[in-house]
């Protein structure tokens, strides 16, 4: 189920304040965040976010195509180890 249109998109306030401060100072720093639920706004373009995936922070560089998506979509939480090998074929 998607979010109600009358509520609008969600962004953590501390994250938005950090980006606004970087934009006013014209700095490009990596912003470390645990907020995977925050929606990407146009002000975020050109910034790099270190998004936590449960174990480590994955760097995510924001481009125009990412607007409207959530930060967590670009930081996978599961690691695919591959399917098991067939031991009969190895001989």
Swiss-Prot record:
Q: Which NCBIfam families match?
A: rpsS_bact
Provide the residue span(s) of the region labelled Disordered. 72-91
Q: Which GO terms describe its cellular component?
A: cytoplasm; small ribosomal subunit
Q: What does this protein do?
A: Protein S19 forms a complex with S13 that binds strongly to the 16S ribosomal RNA.
Please list the residue ranges that the record marks as compositionally biased, kind Basic and acidic residues: 82-91
GO MF annotations in UniProt: rRNA binding; structural constituent of ribosome
Annotated family = Belongs to the universal ribosomal protein uS19 family.
Record key words, sorted: Ribonucleoprotein, Ribosomal protein, RNA-binding, rRNA-binding
For this entry, the protein name equals: Small ribosomal subunit protein uS19
A biological process (GO) annotation for this entry?
translation
Which residues, if any, are the signal sequence? none
- Give the SUPFAM superfamilies listed for this entry: Ribosomal protein S19
């Amino acid at each position: 189920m998607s979010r109600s249109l009358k509520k609008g998109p969600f962004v953590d306030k501390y994250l938005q304040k950090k980006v606004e401060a970087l934009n006013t100072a014209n700095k490009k720093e990596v912003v470390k965040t645990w907020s995977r639920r925050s929606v990407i706004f146009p002000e975020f373009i050109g910034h790099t976010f270190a998004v936590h995936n449960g174990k480590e922070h994955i760097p995510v560089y924001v481009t125009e195509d990412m607007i409207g998506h959530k930060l967590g979509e670009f930081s996978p939480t599961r690691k695919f180890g591959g399917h098991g090998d067939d031991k009969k074929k190895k001989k």
